């Protein structure tokens, strides 16, 4: 396998080395000691000049493909990610796609399968100036806004798909399109959300989204989406578009062991 680097190893590719040094967003993932640039505990993929560079944990000595498969298995097990096609092996998935592409397709396929069962809706409280009374009459707002009697300011509940969970998914499917070549599944998901308002999402606040018996079927898709949003790093350096998809191996190993213990 070409373009493979291992954790805590020096980077010999001069172009890649200069790219990392000149890209501020990447500095926390590498260590520069004098002129020697080394990887640290972060593993994953770094795309630069249309080339994929894999940073892998050294588990099986001198076997790049085996190390990559073990790394991805750890990711999938720790985060409970299912293969896009369970009849297709992980190696076959990776022959034509990089690791980020594979994870995005898994996310999009899982989300689309749930959306085909029905879009999640919930009751949202709204206030509006309407020609007829709907819900609760708001005295103060009517005195403030309505000088004539042809409108009624009221508050009511509406069963709507335009809720925070669907807004999160819409943001995610649009955002991830910039990282992948095959956008088909993401665009199919996007079409389902045509009545949902697009909003910029703060990924540090989305954990406040609550799950119940009506939307719990979307929880795995939500967790994978959150993983992709947090670990995908868009990079722009000298008008060249690239990205990184990196994981802290210390955190990954803890999650992997925690799930293993939970299943005992």
Regions of interest found by a model, annotated:
Residues 1-204, 217-238:
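Terminal, charged accessory segments of proteins
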Residues 61, 117, 253-255, 259:
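A generic structural micro-environment signature
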Residues 210-214, 239-258:
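A short, highly charged nucleic-acid-interacting micro-segment common to nuclease
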Residues 263-264:
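A short acidic/basic microdomain associated with nuclease active sites
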């Amino acid at each position: 396998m070409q373009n493979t680097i291992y954790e805590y190893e020096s980077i010999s590719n001069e172009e890649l080395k200069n790219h990392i040094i000149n890209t501020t967003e990447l500095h926390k993932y590498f260590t520069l000691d004098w002129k020697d640039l080394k990887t640290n505990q972060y593993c994953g993929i770094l795309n630069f000049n249309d080339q994929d560079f894999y940073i892998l944990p050294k588990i099986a000595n001198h076997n790049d493909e085996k190390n990559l498969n073990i790394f991805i298995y750890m990711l999938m097990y720790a985060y409970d990610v299912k293969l896009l096609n369970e009849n297709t092996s992980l190696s076959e998935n990776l022959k034509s796609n990089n690791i980020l592409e594979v994870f995005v397709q898994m996310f999009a396929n899982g989300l689309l399968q749930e959306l085909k069962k029905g879009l999640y809706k919930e009751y949202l409280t709204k206030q509006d100036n309407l020609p007829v009374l709907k819900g609760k009459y708001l005295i103060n707002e009517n005195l403030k806004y309505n000088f004539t009697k042809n409108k009624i300011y009221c508050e009511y509940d509406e069963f709507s798909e335009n809720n925070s969970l669907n807004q999160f998914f819409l943001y995610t499917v649009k955002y991830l399109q910039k990282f992948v070549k095959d956008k088909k599944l993401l665009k199919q998901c996007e079409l389902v959300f045509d009545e949902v308002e697009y909003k910029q999402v703060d990924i540090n606040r989305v954990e406040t989204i609550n799950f119940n018996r009506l939307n719990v079927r979307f929880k795995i898709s939500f967790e994978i989406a959150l993983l992709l949003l947090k670990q995908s790093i868009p990079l722009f350096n000298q008008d060249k578009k690239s990205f990184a998809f990196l994981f802290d191996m210390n955190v990954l190993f803890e999650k992997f062991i925690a799930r293993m213990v939970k299943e005992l």
